[in-house]
């Protein structure tokens, strides 16, 4: 049930990012933000902390959506007063879905925060979607990275 929730939420949030940036770039950014968040979590927890990272990736995607929306609203002028609402919405979803008895709360929080930072930076820099070859390359690298990690996990 937990995994199914992650898959559904990731599809929703990556789909939202994909509408703005393209699906390959969205998958690559989500993975990069999740990796950074998991590295931060590992640095805080130290050795011996195990984490699969699917939830972290879900919260990274939520953070990217929140960061992109913040920049979008800020640029619209009249909505500047409400520009921070997407960040608040992301934090509210984190409070509802990211904490729990056996949840890796720190990984979820770092996923949201790193994702929001990525979303803001990309939102400020990207003026249009990347070309198709970039989308395919980013998506393929993300998929190969995940497959490689699972291969390593199962062969150790």
Feature roles, as predicted:
Residues 1-156:
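A detector for small-residue-rich transmembrane helices and their helix-helix packing motifs
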